[in-house]
Amino acid sequence: MMEATGLEGLESTSSPCPGSTGTGLSWDNGTRHNATFPEPLPALYVLLPVVYSVICAVGLVGNAAVICVILRAPKMKTVTHVFILNLAIADGLFTLVLPTNIAEHLLQRWPFGEVLCKLVLAIDHCNIFSSVYFLAAMSIDRYLVVLATARSRRMPRRTVHRAKVASLCVWLGVTVAVLPFLTFAGVYNNELQVTSCGLSFPRPERAWFQASRIYTLVLGFVVPMCTLCVLYADLLRRLRALRLHSGAKALGKAKRKVSLLVLAVLAVGLLCWTPFHLASIVALTTDLPQTPLVIIVSYVVTSLSYTSSCLNPFLYAFLDHSFRKSLRTACRCQGA
């Protein structure tokens, strides 16, 4: 299961590491709720289920609304909305399995069996990769649109069908990226004989565990973020050149085409996921003791990454006029 970010160091142990989406990969001898964290923070036992429940409820309702509106409204059949739809599906799937995290936390054991353990861990890890890669797809699409507009060119190849194909490729890539975690996922008994859902690596466990962190960090953050940084740096350079050589008309038109919605979704995604991956770097490079402060920071970072799954619908409602209009129409139809 996804747990605290694991800011604590990696200790040598023969037990499987707790399951996680990559945030809570602390190297210890149990889950986050029994052996991982001692009892000096009993407030977490009450607070975490409340936070997770709010995220789950808001995320399920919000993403379900996004999916229904985009599928039913003719005006929402655009390239950008294809990517938004897939991002909502990914976030919705994650919030759908979040109750298992809540149940595990309250029961302090895994009660759901091997099959559901593998499924939940797979969806957990899918959320890491799918979120960032659909954000990247939206940003790359916006980059190409701005460049084409600035050059007064059309984009006949930019179609909804191609966006669907690109989305399918993202899902296939994410599935391949998650397969290694699915292979090692399973139910085990920790040293306290408590049933847990986690990742069971072969020996040497420490090396495998470190490799899993690096794998998630590189594929789930470094590669897509470096790509986006290069693209946006190139975009700024080109727009600056247009201002110098082509006059303000093309530049103004290009600026108008920059989608505030895409930039806002990207910014929120980075805000929610950057601390998550920075925590992985800290865990790989330092050996922090399991102090109350480290435990609290770990859970805060984990909860922040969870929050990304429920914030996007609010951005669409505030920044996307067509989405607001279609949502109001759908609500009126339901009321009638």
Swiss-Prot record:
Disulphide bridges: C117-C197
GO annotation, cellular component aspect: neuron projection; plasma membrane
Keywords from the UniProt entry: Cell membrane, Disulfide bond, G-protein coupled receptor, Glycoprotein, Membrane, Receptor, Transducer, Transmembrane, Transmembrane helix
Chief site of localization: membrane
Residues glycosylated per entry: N29, N34
Coiled-coil region: none
TM segment ranges: 46-68, 81-103, 128-146, 166-188, 214-236, 257-279, 294-316
Residues of the signal peptide: none
Topology, Cytoplasmic side: 69-80, 147-165, 237-256, 317-336
GO molecular function ontology, one term from the record: G protein-coupled receptor activity
UniProt topological domain (Extracellular) ranges: 1-45, 104-127, 189-213, 280-293
Bias (Low complexity): 12-25
Biological function: Interacts specifically with a number of opioid ligands. Receptor for neuropeptides B and W, which may be involved in neuroendocrine system regulation, food intake and the organization of other signals.
Family (UniProt): Belongs to the G-protein coupled receptor 1 family.
PANTHER family hit by this protein: NEUROPEPTIDES B_W RECEPTOR TYPE 2, NEUROPEPTIDES RECEPTOR
The name this protein goes by in its record: Neuropeptides B/W receptor type 2
Source species of the chain: Bos taurus
